[in-house]
Amino acid sequence: MESKPSRIPRRISVQPSGSLSARMVSGNRGTSLNDSYHSRDSSFRLDSEYQSASASASASPYQSTWYSESEITQGARSRSQNQQRDHDSKRPKLSCTNCTSTSAGRNIGSGLNTLSDSSWRPGQVPRSSSMVLGSFGTDLMRERRDLERRRDSSISSLMDYSHRSGDFTAPAYVQERVPSSYSQGARPKENAANTLQLNSSTNHQLPSEHQTVPSSRDSSRSSFRSHFSPRQSESFRNSSHPAFSYLSSRNETPTISSSERAGSSQRPFQESSDNEGRRTTRRLLSRIASSMSSTFFSRRSSQDSLNTRSLSSENYISPRTLTSQSRNNGASSSEVNDGRASEASQGFRFLRRRWGLSSLSQNHSSEPDAENFNQESEGRNTGPWLSSSLRNRCTPLFSRRRREGRDESSRISPSDVPPRSHLFRRESNEVVHLEAQGDSLGAAASRPQASGASGNASASGSTPDLPQGGRNTGIAGILPGSLFRFAVPPALGSNLTDNVTITVDIIPSGWSSADGKSEKAKSAPSRDPEKLQKIKESLLLEDSDEEEEGDLCRICQMAAASSSNLLIEPCKCTGSLQYVHQECMKKWLQAKINSGSSLEAVTTCELCKEKLQLNLEDFDIHELHRAHANEQAEYEFISSGLYLVVLLHLCEQSFSDMMGNTIEPSTRVRFINLARTLQAHMEDLETSEDEF
């Protein structure tokens, strides 16, 4: 299956040390790092420079190793090149002649079958796709240490040792590399540096100064140590010899880059990536803000919230102090943060818009002091000082609100609105009364709301535009006859200029005065004196009725209703327990008899323990008690007789079972005869009771 096409095709040219020509790697983006494998380059060519340089180092293991790997036939070279072309179109591969690292993967068969070196077998390579084998470099280091002790040995012994060292299992030299795969949730640590190295190495060749050949054993040892360190991502720190490291970028395309490039350009890329991320976030938030600003604030919700807020806060005066120092600080800070906060402020201005009514009266003045002061405070309403971009973007919203204001004003007749005196209170507690109509005052008003999150106690305000009253006619139509409270800075005295930042509080018409007395205090329930008098009389009548009620039944707590149900005194109880209705007493005595109480308990008062003196018509307590006793006796006898019949039947059945003479028809006949006998006996008892 072919891999997905790359977003940015890259062509990387690598010229490592040793003058061994590396192939041009044309890498496409793989799906994950586990699918990106190193393929061992089988087309090693050993030129004259390397032969002379390696010959200068006596007893060097490079001679035997490189010569054994260079003895590859031309057919093998062409075959490996063809296979490499086929695989280059499927996934990215790296060819590094210094490392010659091999990994198991999907192309393990075609990449390793072309090798003629006897120390490397395809069967010895582990089949783990998440590991990178650096066996050759580690093998060379161990051979170097052992061959320094055996410098006097011949080349044949070196060849023999190389074959013997090839018998070691390949997993012993597996380098630890954490696979970076998006499917496993892992991300490479050097994201910024790796992405920069991708961009810098695209269609670019490394400088030719990296083509130096290691000419001594110390230099080759240090270069191989830097090449095959356990963590190859840190290999660019060794700058004595060109060290190439395998780095995984964010889009998981394997690259080979130089250490000097990675070290020099890592910091500016991080800054550029951070700035790009900020800009992208701001643009996204600005789009969301512009799309949601038209739906968050409607005129009806603004009016409801305005009325609720005005009634809940009593005598609320929001001071606004605007000095020259604060304006200078606001201007300087806005110049510094203009580029950074321009997009964010446009995106979040609608979140700081406390009251939607201020949008009706837009003051299109463009004083720089007002704009800077607006950017300086976080909890400020941005209605009067909206930027041109956001104002043009929200033009349909403002026009719709103006149109709704005109419709509202047309519905309300001016004759119903009485003239009110608008109270202007400055911060210096000087009160000025101005007589004006509600519809002639063209002042933008916004209800301040404290910003608890930022700790800014100052609330938003709007600049009055008194000369241009025709622009702000909508607010007068929506809130006719309202009381406007202005908070003016004390340093300005009585001068009200156009560039003064003040706070306007809209007090509904229900408020009677500006001293904090709400409509609740005014509209105290003043009842009609006639109604109050009637209520008092009814209460007095109830009290008198209770006093005049007299005797009540101690069972039903009611007075004598009729002559047939009179109150009687059955015992010596006094007070509220003295009297009782006749019907209530009958029901009570019947309940006591049915409960199975004795005759003495029925005829005795439960409270005073005296004998009841009853003279009730058609109610004989003794007869009722005797009848109930007879019923109880019959019930008990029947219950006992049935019990005996069942017991006798069970005994007879068990006896017949024991004797073995069980005959079902005869047993049924006996049971029927026993039942008849019991029934006859009960009839005899009933007749005897009737005779008595």
Curated annotation (Swiss-Prot):
SMART domains assigned to the protein according to its UniProt record, in alphabetical order: RINGv
Binding site for Zn(2+) 2: C571, C573, C605, C608
Biased composition (Polar residues): 61-83, 95-132, 201-214, 235-272, 306-336
Record-listed N-acetylmethionine modification sites: M1
EC code(s) of this entry: 2.3.2.27
Residue stretches of biased makeup (Basic and acidic residues): 37-48, 140-153, 516-532
Ranges of Low complexity composition bias in the record: 215-233, 296-305, 450-462
ZnF segments: RING-CH-type: 545-615
Transmembrane intervals: none
CDD domains: RING_CH-C4HC3_MARCH7
Entry keyword annotation includes tRNA-binding: no
Region (Disordered) location: 1-165, 201-280, 296-343, 360-425, 440-474, 512-532
PTM sites of type Phosphoserine: S318, S389, S688
Name of the protein in its database record: E3 ubiquitin-protein ligase MARCHF7
Source organism: Rattus norvegicus (Rat)
